[in-house]
């Protein structure tokens, strides 16, 4: 959605959509979205709980990745603000109309207003959504940087906290995310420039992935070589295993994210060039907001210990039923053992008594 302030001749670019639909239909769709977001939040909360309870990675890595998952709530706050404007819970003072294109220079598809009065909350919601998107992009680069540092400082990285590393990376990440959000929301750059972080993310992440993989594969071979001359401490061996485990998990997550980005990009392009009806924007938009479901499930089911704990938390009734079955079987086995011992004891004393006759 593009908003033009005719008073100052400035533009505001918001990643939000509005549709020409009856109010009753908007209400039904909003209720469905709300229920879906509750499900997403439930899965996300369980995933964060499992990752925090069973910490299989270095604290510096967890310090970076957990906020990447939790930042979805910022995205949803921005979405709730948009829903409030759609349902006219918040009155903007102007008729918003239909806006289903991500970017446009067509005056007929731009909302022209005399001022931003009444739209401040909507602009803030758009800011939250842009900030979330760029925080995730730069956050992924921060995680890749942390794993590179972990591979370089393999000698003592596992045994030392170095909490300044994730703090420094988060500060840099947020400075870049806020800077990009401000220039994009004020339409100070062309859409191609706005997409540059996404474009650079792929080759940089791939280069880091190759470096970390080759570095740790080489170290693993050296550790497993019985004729090696280099001495590896236990913490160094654990760090190599952790890096390789993080690579396997990261590869699956990146594959899911890339598929997600590709589908969202195709949907946005289709809406921009009117290749699909505007109402399909609901599917494209919510496809982005539902990302915790595939990403969290991929993370949870990629590591056996996380999977077990997640299933126990996500399906508590199934776990309790299985636990009752196990306890019942244990009791039956114990009872059979007691009966068997009792029979053997009775037989022993019977044979002993007969031997004295």
Swiss-Prot record:
This is Serpentine receptor class epsilon-31. Keywords: Membrane, Transmembrane, Transmembrane helix. The chain crosses the membrane at residues 28-48, 61-81, 121-141, 165-185, 192-212, 253-273, 283-303. GO terms for cellular component: membrane. Gene3D superfamilies: Rhodopsin 7-helix transmembrane proteins. InterPro entries: 7TM_GPCR_serpentine_rcpt_Sre (IPR004151). GO terms for biological process: sensory perception of chemical stimulus. It is found in: Membrane. Belongs to the nematode receptor-like protein sre family. It is a multi-pass membrane protein. It comes from the Eukaryota.
């Amino acid at each position: 959605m593009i908003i033009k302030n005719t008073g100052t001749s400035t533009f505001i670019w918001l990643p939000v959509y509005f549709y020409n639909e009856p109010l009753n239909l908007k209400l039904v769709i909003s209720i469905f979205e709300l229920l879906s977001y509750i499900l997403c939040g439930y899965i996300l909360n369980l995933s964060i709980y499992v990752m925090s309870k069973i910490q299989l990675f270095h604290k510096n890595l967890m310090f970076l990745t957990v906020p990447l998952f939790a930042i979805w709530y910022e995205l949803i706050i921005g979405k709730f603000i948009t829903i409030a404007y759609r349902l006219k819970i918040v009155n903007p003072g102007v008729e918003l109309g239909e806006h289903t294109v991500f970017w446009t220079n067509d005056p007929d598809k731009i909302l022209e207003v005399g001022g931003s009065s009444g739209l401040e909350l909507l602009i803030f919601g758009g800011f939250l959504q842009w900030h979330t998107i760029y925080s995730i992009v730069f956050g992924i680069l921060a995680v890749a940087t942390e794993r590179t540092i972990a591979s370089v400082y393999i000698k003592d990285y596992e045994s030392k906290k170095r909490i300044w590393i994730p703090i420094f990376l988060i500060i840099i990440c947020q400075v870049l995310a806020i800077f990009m959000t401000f220039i994009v929301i004020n339409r100070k750059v062309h859409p191609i420039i706005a997409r540059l972080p996404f474009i650079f993310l792929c080759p940089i992440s791939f280069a880091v992935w190759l470096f970390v993989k080759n570095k740790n594969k080489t170290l693993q071979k050296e550790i497993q070589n019985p004729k090696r001359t280099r001495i590896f401490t236990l913490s160094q061996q654990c760090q190599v295993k952790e890096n390789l485990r993080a690579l396997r998990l990261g590869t699956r997550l990146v594959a899911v994210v890339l598929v997600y980005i590709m589908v969202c990009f195709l949907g946005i392009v289709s809406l921009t060039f009117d290749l699909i009806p505007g109402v399909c924007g609901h599917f494209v938009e919510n496809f982005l907001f539902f990302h915790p479901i595939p990403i969290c499930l991929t993370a949870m089911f990629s590591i056996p210990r996380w999977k077990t704990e997640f299933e126990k938390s996500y399906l508590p009734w199934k776990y309790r039923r299985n636990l009752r079955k196990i306890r019942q079987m244990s009791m039956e086995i114990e009872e059979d053992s007691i009966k068997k011992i009792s029979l053997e004891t009775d037989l022993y004393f019977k044979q002993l008594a007969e031997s004295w006759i």
